[in-house]
Amino acid sequence: MTARRAPAVNRDVLEQMLVDGTAALDIALTDAQRNQLLDYVALLGKWNAVYNLTAIRDPKQMLIQHILDSLSIVPHLRDRASARVLDVGSGGGLPGIVLAIVQPDWQVTLNDIVQKKSAFQTQMRAELKLANLSVVTGRVELLQPGVEVPEKFDMIVSRAFADLSDFVKLARHLVAPGGSIWAMKGVHPDDEIARLPEGSRVKQTMRLAVPMLDAERHLIEVVVDEAN
């Protein structure tokens, strides 16, 4: 069966959407970063026809629902200089690749259990020339600092990985002292927060405004006790 092709969209149209979106988020991009993000959208569309990385096939919607959605967390995190970041269940590289592009001083690691998705992520590292990006394949709960990953992380993020309580249970051993777990959610996850495991708590909840997207979005910061 022939894969459905994404509709063609002029790059200038996408660039203007990106310019408008980042202005609304108060994010200043260099020309190089803007081109990297646009190249990423094009490559995501190209590989998606083969690997089905995302259900979204329209480039405009990819820009809004993937790129701008991922960028919406940057204003809340960018004061953390030289951070070590783990993106769990990264899939097509979201939000990790976007973070690596706009925060070149961060060291970003992408994690997924599906080898073909890791292969795509590795290809993006090469094609987008992201020296601050690394990829590790495997279950997050089995990753050990000093073995599969060099060390613990200042920020562990996820955009579409599991229930919040499960996310915390599986990833908490990788949080560095003073670090946090950051979960990107749609509607406010009251039920998931109520099920958080012992030794963890919500530090703050932020409502996100994604440009051009009429949908509810939240960012939840969870801290864990070091003894747990």
UniProtKB/Swiss-Prot annotation:
Q: Which residues bind S-adenosyl-L-methionine?
A: 89, 94, 140-141, 159
Q: According to its record, what are the GO cellular component terms?
A: cytosol
**Localization in the cell:** Cytoplasm
Q: What is its EC number?
A: 2.1.1.170
- Keyword terms: Cytoplasm, Methyltransferase, rRNA processing, S-adenosyl-L-methionine, Transferase
Among the GO molecular function terms of this UniProt record, one is:
rRNA (guanine-N7-)-methyltransferase activity
State the superkingdom: Bacteria
Q: Which NCBIfam families match?
A: rsmG_gidB
The UniProt family comment states: Belongs to the methyltransferase superfamily. RNA methyltransferase RsmG family.
Tell me, what does this protein do in biology? Specifically methylates the N7 position of guanine in position 527 of 16S rRNA.
Name the record gives this protein: Ribosomal RNA small subunit methyltransferase G
- Which organism does this record belong to? Burkholderia ambifaria (strain MC40-6)
Q: Which gene encodes it?
A: rsmG
